[in-house]
Swiss-Prot record:
The keyword Transferase applies. GO terms for cellular component: cytoplasm. The lineage of its organism: Bacteria, Thermotogati, Thermotogota, Thermotogae, Thermotogales. The active site is at 116 (proton donor). SUPFAM superfamilies: EPT/RTPC-like. This is UDP-N-acetylglucosamine 1-carboxyvinyltransferase. It comes from Thermotoga petrophila (strain ATCC BAA-488 / DSM 13995 / JCM 10881 / RKU-1).
Amino acid sequence: MGKLVVQGGTVLEGEVEISGSKNAALPIMAAAILCDEEIILKNVPRLQDVFVMIDILRSIGFRVEFDENELKIKRENDISQEVPYELVRKMRASFNVLGPIAVRTGRAKVALPGGCSIGVRPVDFHLEGLKKMGFSIKVEHGFVEATFERRTDQVTITLPFPSVGATEHLMTTAALLEGTRVVIENAAMEPEIVDLQNFINRMGGRIEGAGTSRIVIEGVEKMQGVEYSIIPDRIEAGTYLVAIAASRGKGLVKNVNPDHLTNFFEKLEETGVKLKVFGNEVEIEMRERPEAVDVTTNPYPGFPTDLQPQMMAYLSIASGVSVITENVFKTRFLHVDELKRMGADIEVSGNVAIVKGVEKLSGAPVEGTDLRATAALLIAGIIADGVTEISNVEHIFRGYEDVIDKFSKLGAKIEYVEKEN
């Protein structure tokens, strides 16, 4: 495990190209289990989590080739019903292969998921939904076993919370339940779910309603091979936009879908940022100290929780007091203590953080606690006086393709240093 050494005080300027969305690619890769024919996915980011999912697909009988950003997936052997624990523990999205394997083979056994440690992520929503679709569920010794027992004509699943993972998992599983109509109420509405629907429908699925709170899936008998391009990563785009604004710079962010970031753009503009949108490119300029704004995270189309830590780093140097309310992951404030080490003035009470803007942050040794928190610390390091050393930095490589290279091309002074044994 290495660390990032960041020389602060740089102004970011230039162009940056946004990669394909990890959060769209992973569920689409899981959905490829539904098909025997070759799937070709384009615009796939080369990230640690993607490589874990590749290993999972290979372990259950699929041939996978990954060349640059193109992924080819085809079933080669009988689908294995069990996924090795050492793969599942690395990433929570791997749990979403449970339903697809079970619907293909009648049974699946998958370890309870790992991944980001930002509070409890119950898989109960997934399991209750699978039960309603006719699967029996057994949980013991850290594993979940799903066995298909009965087919039902009509199923309605109302999610207690619009969980992205549960929505994707249940959609994908239901797509191959021939003769069953599944309705998911209070579904998550994220763009990545629309992307998953579009992919499954291209394979021959019959899903409608993604992007709204009600998704209807008519199960089909089989899927066919397709070629499909993954949407751009809205969180990566937002991260670079915040970083450029925080450094009081100017840049062009390319390969963005602006419709996916409307709420975020509004908040940036409230701080004084100038934004211009040209098709799938966004020009940003910020030369002043930002104005404080209040931010409340909510499920899409609200302000994304995955951009809250980066926004907090930015608002830590704003003029005035910002109130940040976290409504999605209640414990998503692990970055606060690290930002305070750099001189930020932040107080947390429950799911609310009060951020009193300071003139400057100071470089300090800090520790990454999860993917987005580490991105926030990187932004803080870029705008701070002096040198910031971020340890436990491997998180960032799970969600940002070529992150050091992209930031360096914008003018950031960042070096990855291997930890000495």
